[in-house]
Swiss-Prot record:
Family in the record: Belongs to the bacterial ribosomal protein bS16 family.
Keywords of the record: Ribonucleoprotein, Ribosomal protein
UniProt KW Ribonucleoprotein keyword: yes
Protein name, UniProt field: Small ribosomal subunit protein bS16
Source organism: Clostridium acetobutylicum (strain ATCC 824 / DSM 792 / JCM 1419 / IAM 19013 / LMG 5710 / NBRC 13948 / NRRL B-527 / VKM B-1787 / 2291 / W)
Lineage: Bacteria, Bacillati, Bacillota, Clostridia, Eubacteriales
Record flagged with keyword Transmembrane: no
Alphabetical list of InterPro entries matching this protein: Ribosomal_bS16 (IPR000307), Ribosomal_bS16_CS (IPR020592), Ribosomal_bS16_dom_sf (IPR023803)
Any GO BP annotation: translation
Amino acid sequence: MVKIRLKRMGAKKAPFYRIVVADSRSPRDGKFIEELGYYNPTTEPVTFKVDADKVNAWMKNGAQPSETVKKLLDKSGVTTK
């Protein structure tokens, strides 16, 4: 199954995340198919940028967002249906 999920990047105790499409069997920070955006919770205000067209295209093809990504997409106004 293909998932839309967060890939952890950055230094120790200073993480930021890339929003990627990856096979559910690959490791969290491992191989991914495509990068869709990024999320940085350490900045004030929190930085979140995503390509809504790519997200919707992947979801139409059957990709499932993780719970965290789903919450972030809902907050930003990108539809998750």
